[in-house]
Amino acid sequence: MLISDRDIRAEIDSQRIVLEPFEPAMVQPSSVDVRIDKFFRLFDNHKYAHIDPAQEQPELTRLVEVEQDEAFILHPGEFVLGSTYETVTLPDDIAARLEGKSSLGRLGLLTHSTAGFIDPGFSGHVTLELSNMATLPIKLWPGMKIGQLCFFRLSSSAEFPYGQGEYGNRYQGQRGPTASRSHLNFHRTRI
């Protein structure tokens, strides 16, 4: 069940949900707004002939830090990784979903391509998969609102929350935009 602003505040007050830093004004009727950090991962397209999720490709991306009072320019058709300014910590019985801000979506900005779900037990910065679908560059200002987290109460606590090892925890405790670690649990059924 999607939880309301009242329940979100109660979960934050009891420190079952932790957003750091937290600003009470960011709470919306059924979500909490989150901001974008100053770190981005750019794809170095000339390092590899193709992207292979089965292989570690450590030079596929490079980390860029935006200077204070500067914006990151996301060009049309470009895809980069960013992250939330806030760290997010969830209890074992609450999951979250990152959604974009409609005002930014109307400008052509996508905040995630597929990975908007955050498992119960997760702790860290949420990596954003940013795409510019517009025909003009978009300025991304560190600290601006970039999305919103919606929280869902599970029917019971997860038996193996994220970070407990049973299902993997490749991104637990991540700081900033984290490159793909798909090679660590790559699975392919031969068909």
Swiss-Prot record:
Intrachain S-S bonds: none
GO BP terms: dUMP biosynthetic process; dUTP biosynthetic process; nucleobase-containing small molecule interconversion
Annotated pathway: Pyrimidine metabolism; dUMP biosynthesis; dUMP from dCTP: step 1/1
UniProt catalytic activity: dCTP + 2 H2O = dUMP + NH4(+) + diphosphate
Region (Disordered): 169-191
Record keywords, A-Z: Hydrolase, Nucleotide metabolism, Nucleotide-binding
Top-level taxon: Bacteria
Feature: compositional bias, Polar residues: 171-183
InterPro entries: dCTP_deaminase (IPR011962), dUTPase-like_sf (IPR036157), dUTPase_trimeric (IPR033704)
Annotated positions for site Important for bifunctional activity: G116, F117
UniProt GO MF annotations: dCTP deaminase (dUMP-forming) activity; dCTP deaminase activity; nucleotide binding
Active site as annotated: E129
Gene3D superfamilies: 2.70.40.10
UniProt keyword Nucleotide-binding, yes or no: yes
Annotated EC: 3.5.4.30
Record: residues binding dCTP: K101, S102, S103, L104, G105, R106, D119, T127, L128, E129, Q148, Y162, Q174
Similarity-based family: Belongs to the dCTP deaminase family.
Subunit structure: Homotrimer.
Role summary: Bifunctional enzyme that catalyzes both the deamination of dCTP to dUTP and the hydrolysis of dUTP to dUMP without releasing the toxic dUTP intermediate.
Protein's name according to its UniProt entry: dCTP deaminase, dUMP-forming
Organism: Pseudarthrobacter chlorophenolicus (strain ATCC 700700 / DSM 12829 / CIP 107037 / JCM 12360 / KCTC 9906 / NCIMB 13794 / A6)
Lineage of source species: Bacteria, Bacillati, Actinomycetota, Actinomycetes, Micrococcales
Gene: dcd
